[in-house]
Regions:
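First exposed extracellular module after export/assembly in secreted or surface-exposed proteins
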Residues: 2-256
Length: 256
């Protein structure tokens, strides 16, 4: 039904023809098909719908989804030697739906939904050529790379301090990494926030912010800080216009 509706594949029980999608160890990934016994596949499909598919319009599925979605019992990134919950490639996205995933708590399902959707939106930018409007960005690529823009020193701060994140938000950045650099003498540590140093990084961190921060935190941040609010509103509208989604409601909500 998925194929006839959107002209794309939803692979749950691969045959020989599907091995082009890596149900073997090659191309830096190894995918093991899901178990076919009992209601495992049906539960996997339901998990995919609830945590991911239901958040997107038919237009997005038709225009931006890859050629194939794959359900898997194991996804191993053989390049990094890590097992992952999701893997994106030019022509497919694989989702992990093994017993451990199917038996996650409601709160863990909510976290997984955020992870899957965040990964997909970054995939859409990288693989499908989606471009956020120019006015989303604070600076040109060259300006983002300047240290005075990506480094926010906090005078007198120490490692034990957790400096006010409002300082980062006021600059228009959604997140910052609390770290240090040495002064010109290479003897004294200067603590502060390191923020995105490129346009790509800025967009990635904004997605991370939208899909990991509590909504009340996002609301407070954009109400109090104009630069952050402007970027947020541009991205928010672009997601609605181009994906037909509202990030506030697309994520799976825990039932307990």
């Amino acid at each position: 039904q998925y194929y006839y509706r959107f002209g794309k594949l939803l692979i749950v029980d691969p045959d020989t023809a599907d091995y082009v999608f890596n149900f073997q160890s090659k191309y830096d990934v190894r995918i093991v098909p899901p178990k076919q016994e009992g209601d495992h596949v049906e539960r996997g499909l339901e998990l995919l719908k609830e945590l991911f598919l239901n958040g997107y319009s038919d237009r997005v599925k038709q225009e931006l989804f890859p050629y194939a979605l794959i359900l898997a019992d194991t996804i191993e990134n053989t390049f990094t030697d890590q097992y992952v919950n999701m893997y994106t490639a030019d022509r497919y996205i694989a989702f992990l739906v093994n017993d451990q995933m199917l038996n996650r708590t409601e709160k863990d399902k909510e976290k997984l939904s955020r992870e899957w959707n965040n990964t997909f939106l970054n995939y859409s930018m990288d693989k499908a050529g989606w471009v956020v409007p120019e006015k989303f960005y604070l600076y040109s690529e060259t300006e983002y790379a300047k240290k005075e823009n990506w480094w926010i020193p906090i005078e007198g701060a120490t490692e034990k301090d957790t400096a006010d994140i409002n300082i980062v938000w006021e600059r228009g950045y959604p997140t910052g990494n609390w770290t240090y650099y040495y002064d010109d003498t290479w003897t004294n540590k200067i603590w502060g926030y390191a923020v995105s140093s490129s346009r790509e990084g800025y967009l990635e961190k904004f997605f991370e912010f939208l899909f990991t921060a509590p909504q009340e935190t996002i609301n407070k941040a954009i109400v109090d800080h104009e630069k952050l609010r402007n970027a947020h509103d541009v991205l928010d509208q672009a997601l609605k216009d181009d994906f037909g989604i509202d990030y506030r409601t697309m994520i799976y909500e825990a039932k307990d």
